[in-house]
Amino acid sequence: MSKNSVIIVAAGKGKRMNSSISKQFLQIKNKPILYYTLNKFSTHESIDEIVLVTLEDKIEVCSEIIDKYSINKVSKIVPGGKERQDSVYNGLKAVSKDCEVVLIHDAARPFVTSDIIENGIRYANQYGAAACGIIPKDTIKIKNEKGFAIDTPNREDLFIAQTPQCFNYNIILDCHEKLKKHNKKVTDDTMVLEDYGKSVYLYEGSYSNIKITTPEDLILGEQILEKLT
């Protein structure tokens, strides 16, 4: 029977947080951010397996969090790579061989909703690849190399990508292997498919589905958690 697997990418060092502690291990309401992220997927009925990718020297810390909070469905904890795309590739190689749909999600994005997860799986099955996100609230400017505004794109045509990004497993694995062979750099997994001519369906995420990367995000995260609970 085919599985829906999720790769949680927790290999970042969190330089923008100005903290010696990696952002995924910082706490909101006395629990690490990683707990909230893992718990959201482990309690979702459509998720069969979690593969956690982290820094090699943080594997033990992650194991302790999983044990302390009795997180289910984590099949493996694997070390990350030099870049995010290397970490994702390590995760892809570690998922179960009967995986059909794989979701790739930032560990520092703890407020993903059940609907976002479910819709991602549905659209990945339908289109082969899907990513959630939001239309920007602010006006976006394009500037030239001298710092002057040269264009103002229509906000309705713009999309701020979030995670999870959801894929047919064989498609994303094949594209990552090509990426590695050609030594290309990308900043998210939809770019991996775009580089090889594959289409990605974009669907509605949530303005609360923030990635916690700065001290200000921690404050906002506490406010979001209070509203959710």
UniProtKB/Swiss-Prot annotation:
Pfam families, per database record: IspD
**UniProt site (Positions MEP for the nucleophilic attack):** R155, K211
Q: Which molecular function term from Gene Ontology is one that the record holds?
A: 2-C-methyl-D-erythritol 4-phosphate cytidylyltransferase activity
The enzyme class is transferase
GO terms in the biological process aspect are: isopentenyl diphosphate biosynthetic process, methylerythritol 4-phosphate pathway
Q: Which residues bear the site annotation Transition state stabilizer?
A: R16, K23
Sorted alphabetically, which PROSITE patterns does this protein's record hold?
Answer: ISPD
The EC number of this protein is 2.7.7.60
* Catalytic reaction list: 2-C-methyl-D-erythritol 4-phosphate + CTP + H(+) = 4-CDP-2-C-methyl-D-erythritol + diphosphate
UniProt keyword annotations, A-Z: Isoprene biosynthesis, Nucleotidyltransferase, Transferase
Q: Does the keyword Aminoacyl-tRNA synthetase apply?
A: no
Function summary: Catalyzes the formation of 4-diphosphocytidyl-2-C-methyl-D-erythritol from CTP and 2-C-methyl-D-erythritol 4-phosphate (MEP).
The record's similarity note reads:
Belongs to the IspD/TarI cytidylyltransferase family. IspD subfamily.
HAMAP family assigned to the protein according to its UniProt record, in alphabetical order: IspD
Q: What protein name applies here?
A: 2-C-methyl-D-erythritol 4-phosphate cytidylyltransferase
